[in-house]
Curated annotation (Swiss-Prot):
It is found in: Cytoplasm. It catalyses: 2-deoxy-alpha-D-ribose 1-phosphate = 2-deoxy-D-ribose 5-phosphate; alpha-D-ribose 1-phosphate = D-ribose 5-phosphate. Pathway: Carbohydrate degradation; 2-deoxy-D-ribose 1-phosphate degradation; D-glyceraldehyde 3-phosphate and acetaldehyde from 2-deoxy-alpha-D-ribose 1-phosphate: step 1/2. Pfam families: Metalloenzyme. The keyword Cytoplasm applies. InterPro entries: Alkaline_phosphatase_core_sf (IPR017850), DeoB (IPR010045), Metalloenzyme (IPR006124), Phosphopentomutase_DeoB_cap_sf (IPR024052). This is Phosphopentomutase. The gene is deoB.
Amino acid sequence: MQFKRVFTVVLDSVGIGEASDAANFNDVGADTLGHIGAFYGEQFKLPNLQKLGLGNIRASDPIKGVPAAQPALGYFGKMQETSVGKDSMDGHWEMMGLPVKEPLGFFPNGFPNELIQKLAAFSGRSVIVNRPYSGTDVIRDYGEEQLATGALIVYTSGDSVLQIAANEAVIPLEELYRICEYARQITIEKPYRIGRVIARPFKGQDKDHFERTSDRHDYTLEPTGTTDMDRLKAAGLDVLAVGKINDIFSGKGITSGVHTESNHDGMVQTIKNAQTDFTGFSFTNLVDFDAMYGHRRNPEGYGAALMAFDQQLGELLAVLKPDDLLLITADHGNDPGFRGTDHTREYVPLLAYSSRLSGNQSLGVRSTFADLGATILENFDCPAGEVGTSFLTQLK
């Protein structure tokens, strides 16, 4: 065991430029970090990410405000996704050695009437919208109708998701969760095979004051095989989940999980883990980048959130011990400067840091996100999974 604890922080949707297969997803030109940097110019400051080597990943095509560090304190590279989709589930499962190879169901024109009728019959409520929509726009446009009628707002996006929004004043949280659990049960198999069912509670009395609450809940497909988290847990190691990690893996392979209210809260919980004595893996997802800024195509808010994270990253670095390893990455892109409102197929950054390592080395372009999980397994002397190549020996 080289490191007693490994911390992985997933910056949800923070891509670093179009992937080699971006054309297959109509995402040529997508560049989440690059376009945020272009929006801010030299005001874009990420000093902690920069010193770890974020700018070194693409020194030949610099991110505005984030030049290459000389030398970088960490190891730097980028990873290519091999899963057939570009959803959070695909990205996280692949990181943990389980690439998604069977396509999920997508419903760009709304869900079939048969499915809608089942939801209406089970809930005793009518269903409105049933088409792709931005989550904030849909409650602005239909929230007052939902509040007046008690209907379910059902909508989707460019991802494999079925989302149900309801005002807590007319549909209590427990009821919304029960409806979503039913929706999950009936959409596991083909012809639906929907990646995630998401409960989207909101509050407020009119469209000028509606806001989504932090009680969102994701009901994902259960992992279709053994993940690296399962392997770590089976070896008796601690596997701590922060944020929506627990939802993404349906609780599998996790010894302790905590939901979070925001990026800030996610980092507070991660720092708390770092101040706790454990042996194993802490896995954090920071979803605000994606949910609040990427889908809403808000480069200003996205950049501000990255700079706020960078400050908290400094706090985390200050409490990490010499036998800790920090890995920072992302699960897909969601370029706020790109067309549409959906995820973008991009490379994701890979940063590795430990205070006892010399750093300043490139990890190159990894051919799958699964290299991250393979590295963690090798560190803890666990049997390797079927996918992924460890880069542990490069960390020296």
